[in-house]
Amino acid sequence: MTGQNIRIRLKAFDHRILDASTREIVSTAKRTGASVRGPVPLPTRIEKFTVNRSPHVDKKSREQFEMRTHKRLLDIVDPTPQTVDALMKLDLAAGVDVEIKL
């Protein structure tokens, strides 16, 4: 896999789980002999929802909720076959969404 990069994009609602998963991927890649660029923190997506507090009246009384999606980007430069195998066998936290592009 010479001259090829692996781009890994991670998404999660909890930044602590996301950072732990990022550290795990970086240590696995470095242990197998690949060099890593990143992690690059991408902009956090904030979705806000505004709802009425009461079911019937009082339009002025509202409540706001927000959902934050944290993102990180990793580039693994010149991965070895051992790196690819180790990344496939890696078990990450349940709340982390992983997108891999070759």
Curated annotation (Swiss-Prot):
Organism this protein belongs to: Agrobacterium fabrum (strain C58 / ATCC 33970) (Agrobacterium tumefaciens (strain C58))
Output one GO MF annotation: structural constituent of ribosome
Q: What is this protein called?
A: Small ribosomal subunit protein uS10
Subunit organization = Part of the 30S ribosomal subunit.
Kindly give the SUPFAM superfamilies that the UniProt entry links to this protein.
Ribosomal protein S10
Recorded hits in PROSITE patterns, A to Z, give:
RIBOSOMAL_S10 (PS00361)
| Keyword terms, alphabetized | Ribonucleoprotein, Ribosomal protein
Keyword Ribosomal protein recorded: yes
**GO CC terms of this entry:** ribonucleoprotein complex; ribosome
**Gene3D superfamilies, from UniProt?**
Ribosomal protein S10 domain
Q: What does this protein do?
A: Involved in the binding of tRNA to the ribosomes.
One GO biological process term is: translation
Query: What's the family?
Result: Belongs to the universal ribosomal protein uS10 family.
HAMAP family with a match to the protein in the record: Ribosomal_uS10
Q: Indicate whether Ribosomal protein appears among the record's keywords.
A: yes
- Which gene is this protein's source? rpsJ
Looking up Pfam families in the UniProt record yields: Ribosomal_S10
